[in-house]
Amino acid sequence: MTYLTRILETKAEEVAELKKQDPERRYHEACGDLPATRDFRSAITSLDGGINLIAEVKKASPSRGVLVEDFRPLDIAERYAEIGASAFSVLTDRQYFQGSPDYLKAITQKFSIPVLRKEFIIDESQIYETRLMGADAALLIVAALEPSQLRDYLQLFAELGLHALVETHDERELDTALEQGSTIVGVNNRDLKTFTVDLMTSVRLRQRMPDGIVSVAESGMKHRDDIQMMQEAGFDAVLIGEGLLVSEELRQFSWG
């Protein structure tokens, strides 16, 4: 069983429980009274040839285990804001990444920087939940969804004022993302089936993206040269979690 398959099975169980606790109708009604979201798309769009940082607040991963023993999400976010992060990515998955919706809520309340919910979304109820948490954007993984689901979820995101970072890993997934109307497209250098990393995945797929797409390279970048490679490939932003924890080079990079 692959990492992704295992995670999605767990998500199906979580969604079933979520629907018992708070039906979608109540979620929908509650979302109508919320303030406007912050503009995630504009925050990460490169206007002058620079590259923006989506800094991930991350405690653990399935492949590496716990990355930060004394995990203080607000302190981590503060450091990332100081080095020039354009947006935050916050893990809310509990079982595999030891994340929490509470981390996301705390960060959205303290900072004016847009916040992306990093989660494995497989059901509309999670999208309403995302809006109620205070997130400005969320991840949609092409490998976890049918094309028709992706199209419908993108429409719901727009209705709720959310932006979607649509994650791809190969040419087929990129084509699906574009065909279904994605405007912010990420390329994950990490294969979610095996968790192996190849930075050339981003470089290769970026060449296939048309003008007007906001592009994000994700995972595996740990050195200044890695960021420069993504910048030269034409990416608007990079999403980095573990690399910021281990690399002084990345913390001192000139972001934006």
Swiss-Prot record:
Pfam families: IGPS
EC id: 4.1.1.48
TM ranges: none
Domain of life of the source: Bacteria
Record's keyword terms, sorted: Amino-acid biosynthesis, Aromatic amino acid biosynthesis, Decarboxylase, Lyase, Tryptophan biosynthesis
PANTHER family, per the entry: INDOLE-3-GLYCEROL-PHOSPHATE SYNTHASE, TRYPTOPHAN BIOSYNTHESIS PROTEIN
Family: Belongs to the TrpC family.
Protein's UniProt name: Indole-3-glycerol phosphate synthase
Gene for this chain: trpC
